Amino acid sequence: FFKQKTAYEISTRDWSSDVCSSDLARCLVHRYPKAHASLLFVFSLCLGANSLPELLYAQHTPPEVVADQIRWVRIPSGKFMMGSPVPPSQLAMDFKEYEREGSYFQDEYPQHVVEITKPFFISPTEVTVGQFRLFVEETGYRTEAEVDGFGGWGFDPKEKKCVGRDPRFTWRDAGYLQTDLFPVVNVSWADCQAYCKWLSTKEKRIVRLPTEAEWEYCNRANIYLHYNVGNTSQSVLEGARTRKPTKESIRQAVQNLEIDPDDSTSFPQRVGLYAPNAFGLYDMHGNVWEWTNDWYDADYYKYSPLKDPQGPVQGYVKIRRGGGWNSFPLWARSSFRNWNTAESRCVNLGFRVVAELSSWEIEEYNKQQPIRLNFVGDIMLDNGPGNAIMNGIDPFANVASWLLDSDATIGNLECVLGREGEMILKPYNYLGAKNSDQFLKRYFTALSLANNHAYDFGPEGLMGTVNILKQNGIGSFGAGEDINSARHGLLLNVRGRKVALLGYNHFRMEDYEATETKPGCASLKTEWVIEDIKRVKKDWNAEIVIPFLHWGREMQDAPLDIQRIEAKQWIDAGATAVIGGHPHVVQTVDSYRGAPIIYSLGNFVFDYYPVDPLVWIGWGVRLTIPPSGPVEWE
């Protein structure tokens, strides 16, 4: 496995093809879709949070960069957690040598879910001097530093530090050795816009600066540490062009730091000298800061939209990201937010560009890609998990990156969210904590309600739960206002492919069964499942059909013989996979005609049976479903 090509070994010819992130560690390129990323996940756990496999950041040959062509990297759509993975107080502790209060980091918080809904192209490197020169030669463009005559910033060897604004310094000369392969600097935000407009004409597509969300999504490539190269300052000092702080220098402004003119490591480098991240992008930390398209607002994360945030509609300063060659590691972190006035031109500030795909390209791209569906087991947000939510703690936080790293995530909700109704008489009743919906909507596309706890507060509680989920954009299935709605199922459009989810309950099903006049669950009857599979394939033209069952015996590690028989019958009827839960433990798995049968996922978020170690193990299952061929799963 480790001998296969990793992302940093992609040839320039590969850059124009899909450089997709693999599961969890996201380290392999698109050409190796069957690589077992779970191995890297285990490997990363063994290494601990402070390091990543050295393989990813080994020596490599810098990429070929030419002035007359951007070799785009295609970035897939997806969800990620934006912002600092730890709260401001912890950041202050992690970087205590900088003597910063927690409030200094407040604009990186709260960490929140962002969905990038469309794939896009991004330049693998920062725009180079040579690439910018071609733009100037073809258009006669003059930068703001040249037009206003004030110049930019640059290195003065006599003073041994950077000075500015100074007419001596523009994008053509920053005072240090600078070839056509170096990142262009001393360009204002307006200069970047002019370059994008010119390149849009040449590329025959919209070219622009990345949004702040797109930039962090690309930087992280699903790595939720301080840096995409590790979690310590040393990791970014070794994996990017940044400056090592000292007790003396850490208290000085960057522009006042003395620089040795004979030390080439004190300045920017040619692009791509360090290994890329898992998306195949170079210098996302250090080298030069990078302009983004967004205005800055310190409180923006508090009201930022979930999908494709564009930043505030107006502001006074523009956001820049990533840190520069003279930045200390604190400011090169993946989540660090910095800003400049739009007319700024700096010796450590450049840019990279994004190109939008047409609607036709997105449609064709989606047709060629597999879709990935995550399934998890029992979710109960009362008791311990409920207390956590009441205290503002996210019970899903430790697996957030895995939950988000899919096209859709589905679970089994074993509690009531609605406040209507009365508690029915039974041994265990679960009422999800207030605000549970705010955490569920971060991660879940759909939830099955076909279980014995959906009815804990009677029909009013059940329908209240259905309505709350609907209000939060979460689909539900397996229960409803009558038997028709309970059996109806849920149709998802997952990147242009139709996925039908069907839910059924077997445990004491007579007590919770929906009828023609009463809300409840869809009971697990083999003939109903077969009928419903055939119905959704015919009426909805569903390509993918997955029954999600609440069945089996509790605390048993193997299914009943009848379950094995029924699962095969449903696959014969057209089911793509069969997924189950309820026993509170994981069970044997089967495969039939290439379709996986997961009899029980066990608990996911649940503190029932706290003294029994068997229930401490739960599975998350990912189905990878290509346009044609068998389903892959892990």
Describe every region a protein language model picked out.
Residues 30-32:
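Intrinsic-disorder-associated, low-complexity terminal segments enriched in Asp/Asn/His/Tyr and depleted
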Residues 41-43, 52-164, 168-169, 189-190, ...:
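Short, compositionally biased
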